[in-house]
A protein has these predicted regions:
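A charged alpha-helical hairpin associated with nucleic-acid processing machineries
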Residues: 28-29, 70-79, 106-122, 128-275
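Phosphate-handling DNA/RNA-contact segment within nucleic-acid enzymes
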Residues: 1-118, 135-136
Length: 275
């Protein structure tokens, strides 16, 4: 049941899948325990271990902490997505209850659709190192297709070497929530992350910016947000909005985005795995 059954090792002997681990129950939105995460107490690998997937437990759908956050608030203003269930637990202990974590996977469309059932704003919280930024690009790409009017996606990056667990112990909940309040909106994150690589004041830089941002706009649903993104790109590149709309429409014939940052999850990551 929920992955607590014993397994056989290479010698054929039975053993407890989660032996010598701190257990974190993973609940669905109704509060039913559908899986577990286990954090090892020693230097044994892997550091984190999840229950195997079952008909009730799918990592690509479930969010650790969503049940608890939904119970704590009558109305959830926003949800902060962190990288591990230990982060969720420590933040809650320090008074920050609007946090959830994916279960060792990149955020999926299913995750985001579930989040937006309970709040209109999601804030991705990542470590400030290179791996964190690459994970943010992946979250950005996943978010584009569900950014309809009335929904908000933001990004916050912690100082390099810090994670939610360590930083809230240092600065406390009040200052941590100030960092949350200053999170970067998705539109600004797109332009800031791409513009940083090019001289957007030069013709070449403006051309490159257009080439990279247009495929991202194409992924967005029609609506006010998409229109405003085209307008913002027009101001930054001096291209007419009508021309940008034409170029966005042409992306229908392009099966692959021209913006493909080198996003990956480090093989030495401490994210949970199945076993």
């Amino acid at each position: 049941i929920v992955g607590l059954l014993i397994d056989r090792n290479e010698e054929g002997k039975l053993y407890d899948r989660f032996r010598n681990r701190i257990m974190f129950p993973i609940r669905d939105i109704r509060g039913r325990t559908i899986g577990f995460g286990g954090r090892v107490l020693s230097d044994e690998k892997p550091k984190y271990l999840n229950s195997p997937e079952t008909p009730l437990f799918h990592k690509g759908r479930e969010l650790y902490g969503l049940y608890e956050a939904n119970r704590h608030f009558r109305s959830i203003e926003n949800l902060i997505v962190v990288e591990g269930y230990m982060d969720v637990a420590v933040l809650a202990q320090n008074g920050v209850h609007n946090t959830v974590a994916t279960l060792g996977t990149a955020v999926t469309i299913e995750h985001l659709n579930k989040i937006f059932r309970y709040t209109s704003e999601v804030i991705f919280c990542f470590d400030g190192d290179e791996a964190g930024k690459k994970a943010a690009y992946r979250a950005l790409d996943t978010s584009l297709s569900i950014i309809v009017d009335g929904r908000s996606v933001k990004f916050m990056f912690l100082p390099e070497g810090e994670d939610p667990d360590t930083i809230i112990r240092k600065i406390g909940a009040k200052k941590f929530l100030e960092l949350v309040a200053n999170a970067t909106p998705l539109s600004e994150f797109i332009f800031e992350s791409i513009s940083a690589e090019y001289d957007h004041n030069s013709v070449d830089g403006k051309a490159k910016l257009s080439k990279l941002v247009i495929p991202l706009i194409h992924k967005m649903p029609s609506g006010v947000f998409r229109t405003l993104m085209i307008r913002a790109l027009s101001k930054k590149t001096d291209l007419e909005e009508s021309e940008l709309k034409r170029l966005v429409k042409l992306e229908n014939n392009n099966n692959q985005s021209t913006y493909t940052p080198n996003v990956y999850f480090d093989e030495n990551s401490e994210q949970p795995i199945d076993h």
